[in-house]
From Swiss-Prot:
Locus of motif 'KMSKS' region: 631-635
One cellular component term from this protein's GO annotations in UniProt: cytosol
Family designation: Belongs to the class-I aminoacyl-tRNA synthetase family.
Protein name: Leucine--tRNA ligase
A single GO molecular function term of this UniProt record: aminoacyl-tRNA deacylase activity
Protein's organism: Blochmanniella pennsylvanica (strain BPEN)
Catalysed reaction, written as an equation: tRNA(Leu) + L-leucine + ATP = L-leucyl-tRNA(Leu) + AMP + diphosphate
Keyword ATP-binding: yes
Placement of sequence motif 'HIGH' region: 42-52
GO biological process: leucyl-tRNA aminoacylation
Amino acids binding ATP: 634
Primary subcellular site in the record, as a coarse category: cytoplasm
Length: 872
């Protein structure tokens, strides 16, 4: 063992050992309890960032810990390799996206290996490889045959920059989640998967997920948005047509004075054929949707156009004018594109009615029985009140009236109960090149067929062709630009391929299952292997995926279950959502007013006495503005390159800091001083063990002859095992686990080391510490374990077990003072009197040097805590 700790010397050696011996490769073993630990699959963007490092370090700590418990641990890794960034890079560099993607994978793989993660690299997946997406295409054809897939022309979210459709979940503040371009609404043919068929299962399944963060479950419940209501059918005057509208609140039904429909509602489109005003209104307000969403609807002018068509109120038989309105969005109106209007009790409806001189009819008094004043605004929403102006329902409470009105409507044959969902079917068509081709063809007679199994996979055309730019400068590189590829055959008949590709969330919705059998060629999954490993025991990823990936992840699992591929109802038992990694951010303002963000590593900082930043300058001497701790990002240029930090401090120090600096679900503030502190601690461990070994061989530990000080050390060692085990396993409080280990190391530095049993106790303690540290800092632990004489490699060592005898509470630690100064500590039986404690001190002979030539005048004793001997 070398005298000095040098991570660059040991880490590569240990990593080569793991790679050569395939230490972490696993197979199914029915004789061992399995444990499947998985961090969310990374996108090969070109470089790991510290968010990646935090995510994968957490997974590795848990995996190594579970392995030490004797479990058969699967921890795989792969690459979610399709997507727009690769396509954009290819366009920019005039190359094929596969070249960019595989180059990035090779580099990022080397980064992961340099951090020492215990992956089974034999199971590495790359989702853009045909061997992977072949089965995704096959499964799509299975769902199509089951009726769970359909194609329709629909109003969709359209990103004009990327020239592709976005799912509802991919729209943030009415902008594309990637490029932040305002989203437009467009009607185009799209493939959908019926996720709404599984809405109740997805909702009720959340109750099984007792080890998922409550915040994630709340977000999914809200996104699914189950509501109970009534579908009410309104007859159209002088027509056999009807208009059906979903309602959740019926006590205000008698206050309906007009109806509104969206600009693409069939009634609106029909009227537009003969009414130029309506036609012009529809055309004019198409762009309105680019500005509108649920959050800002109140800040835009509400506009409408009468259709001169009337619906009939089912109870009063009064005529209700139907208006085309710019604030009715089909996907926001439960897919019906129509809504009732009760202007007396809804501010948006009131504003519209006031503007166009439509009737306003109040029908609910508050519980004080005062009629609402609606001259200036609608009545504030009330959950309860008394009906008036409502005919036969006058005088009823809101609750009673709701039930009575529903019964009346049902009796008239114009209403039925309906459970509705905010969740909409998953639109999976994307109009880009770099994705999985949708395996459908259209015959010359217009019949659509799924591609046959023996013709799968449908592979992308080789090499992206000439870049196509539209008049507005946006790139259109969808598969429709590849005419030779589009032409194909189906059972000898001429056919054309579908030119859309799958939403990339498809690939990331089932990768976890394919990890269980990545080289299996006979089916999508090897059912035996999949159901040995599944469900995932521990899944790790950011909470930002709550209503996208994590919802599709659960949905896809249920689809595979219903195909008999997996047996469990949910894909993952436990979910951990780690916090973001934050770093200092600095900028200056350029002459043209732009914020120019400066790499923190190029900044010189002056701090005040409490550590606050009071001045910052860049390498050119320019004064900078400090923007605080922000999420590491390219946009603020405050990311930290893991390679530089690993080279400087070592992978173990990085891993230690990542796990120690903050509770795992909280944001982590990146500070290089914290990495320095982690490395100092590892050096202390190394030095402690080095000097212990230099002192020569160690006798066997004999617990029956230990003195009080030695027992005290063992007590601390085994209490630390107990705490660290609970912190890692149950609480997942990794920072407090490391804190406990650090406290124990400090105690060992001060422990007696003179006698052979002193050294035997220390040997036991050091072997424990190295094993406790192994999940966090595996490289240094590997070397120190061997140096201490540990049997085999530490990779095969077991987690330390608490010696319950060592931590029994029949003894207590009493502090010993001479004239008020701390001189010693002694273990004494609980509740001993001062004579017993003093006798123990006499037996140990530790007081003699302090009492020579002195007379004891008094002994002050606080039971179980302190004894103070007063001597002169």
């Amino acid at each position: 063992m070398r005298k000095s700790y040098s991570p660059s010397d040991i880490e590569s050696v240990v990593q080569k050992h793991w790679y050569k011996n395939k230490t972490f490769a696993v197979i199914e073993d029915s004789n061992k309890e399995k444990y499947y630990c998985l961090s969310m699959i990374p996108y090969p963007s070109g470089n790991l960032h510290m968010g990646h490092v935090r995510n994968y370090t957490i997974g590795d700590v848990i995996s190594r810990y579970q392995r030490m418990l004797g479990k058969n641990v699967l921890q795989p890794i792969g690459w979610d390799a399709f997507g727009l960034p690769a396509e954009h890079a290819a366009i920019k560099n005039n190359t094929d996206p596969s070249i960019w993607t595989y180059s990035n994978i090779n580099y990022m793989k080397s980064q992961l290996q340099s951090l020492g993660f215990a992956y089974d690299w034999n199971r590495e997946l790359i989702t853009c490889h045909p061997d992977y997406y072949r089965w995704e295409q096959w499964f799509f054809t299975v769902l199509y045959k089951k009726g769970l897939v359909y194609k329709k022309t629909a109003s969709v979210n359209w990103c004009s920059y990327h020239k592709t459709v976005l799912a509802n979940e991919q729209v943030t503040n009415n902008c594309c989640w990637r490029c932040h371009t305002p989203v437009k609404y467009k009607r185009i043919p799209q493939w959908f998967i019926r996720i709404t068929n599984y809405a109740d299962q997805l909702l009720h399944g959340l109750d099984q997920l007792t080890h998922w963060p409550e915040q994630v479950k709340i977000m999914q419940r809200n996104w699914i948005g189950r509501s109970k209501g009534v579908n009410v059918t309104f007859r159209i005057e002088n027509s056999n047509d009807t208009l059906t509208i979903y309602m959740t609140r019926l006590d205000i039904f008698m206050g309906i004075t007009y109806l509104v429909i969206s600009t693409d509602h069939p009634i609106a489109l029909q009227v537009a054929k003969t009414d130029l005003n309506v036609a012009h209104f529809i055309q004019k307000n198409d762009d309105f949707y680019t500005k509108l969403n649920k959050k800002n609807v109140f800040y835009f002018e509400k506009m409408g156009m009468p259709t001169h068509i009337y619906a009939i109120h089912p109870i009063t038989n009064s005529k209700l004018p139907i208006w085309v309105a710019n604030f009715v969005i089909p996907m926001e109106c439960d897919g019906m594109g129509a809504a009732i209007s009760i202007p007396a009790h809804n501010q948006q409806d009131w504003e519209f009615a006031y503007k166009y001189n439509l009737p306003i009819k109040p029908v609910i008094k508050n519980l004080d029985a005062i009629e609402p004043n609606i001259a200036m605004q609608a009545q504030e929403t009330t959950c309860d009140g008394i009906l008036f102006n409502s005919g036969e329902f006058d005088g009823l409470s809101s609750c009673t009236a709701s039930n009575a009105i529903v019964k009346s409507l049902i009796a008239r044959g114009v209403a039925q109960y309906k459970v509705n969902y905010r969740l909409k079917d998953w639109g999976i068509s994307r109009q880009r090149y770099w994705g999985v081709p949708i395996p459908m063809v259209t015959l010359s007679n217009g019949v659509v067929k799924p591609v046959l199994l023996d013709r799968l996979p449908v592979i992308l055309p080789k090499n992206m062709s000439t870049i196509h730019r539209s008049n507005d400068g946006y790139v259109d590189n969808s598969l429709k630009m590849y005419p030779n590829w589009i032409q194909t055959t189906y059972k000898g008949q001429a056919a054309i391929r579908d030119t859309d590709t799958f939403d990339t969330f498809m690939e990331s919705s089932w990768y976890y299952a394919r990890y269980t059998c990545p080289r299996y060629n006979d089916a999508m999954l090897n059912v035996h292997a999949a159901n040995y490993w599944l469900p995932v025991d521990q899944y790790i990823g950011g909470i930002e995926h709550a209503i996208m990936h994590l919802l599709y992840f659960r949905f896809y699992h249920k689809l595979m279950r219903d195909e008999g591929l997996v047996y469990s109802d949910e894909p993952a038992i436990r979910l951990l959502c780690q916090g973001m990694v934050l770093a200092d951010s600095f900028y200056y303002v350029s002459p043209n007013g732009q914020h120019i963000w400066v790499d923190p590593t190029h900044v010189t900082i002056k701090r005040d006495r409490i550590g606050g930043i009071v001045k910052a300058i860049d390498k050119d001497g320019r004064d900078l503005i400090y923007d605080g701790m922000c999420k590491m990002s390219k946009s603020k240029n405050n990311g930290i390159d893991p390679n530089i930090i690993i080279e400087k401090y070592g992978a173990d120090a990085v891993r230690f800091f990542i796990m120690f600096a903050a509770p795992i679900e909280a944001p982590l503030e990146w500070k290089e001083s914290g990495i320095e502190g982690a490395q100092r601690f590892l050096k202390r461990i190394w030095n402690l063990i080095y000097h212990h070994i230099q002192d020569g061989p160690v006798d066997a530990l004999s617990v029956v002859i230990l003195n009080h000080a030695q027992k005290f050390i063992r007590y601390n060692v085994h209490k630390t095992i107990e705490k660290v085990t609970d912190d890692i396993d149950r609480r997942q409080s990794f920072n407090t686990a490391l804190s406990a280990i650090m406290k124990l190391v400090k105690k060992l530095y001060n422990a007696p080391k003179t006698s052979m049993q002193d050294r035997a106790v220390l040997q036991e303690a050091l072997l424990v510490i190295v094993r406790l540290l192994y999940p966090f800092t595996p490289h240094i632990s590997f070397i120190l374990w061997k140096a201490l004489g540990g049997s085999e490699d530490i990779d095969n060592a077991t987690w330390p077990i608490v010696d319950t005898q060592a931590i029994q509470n029949d003894r207590t630690l009493v502090l010993v003072q001479i004239n008020g100064k701390m001189r010693h500590k002694v273990f004494a039986p609980l509740n001993s009197d001062k004579n017993v404690v003093y006798k123990l001190l006499e037996t140990e002979g530790v007081l003699n040097k302090y009492l020579i030539g002195k007379k004891i005048n008094n002994i002050i004793y606080v039971p179980n805590r302190v004894i103070n001997i007063i001597a002169k």
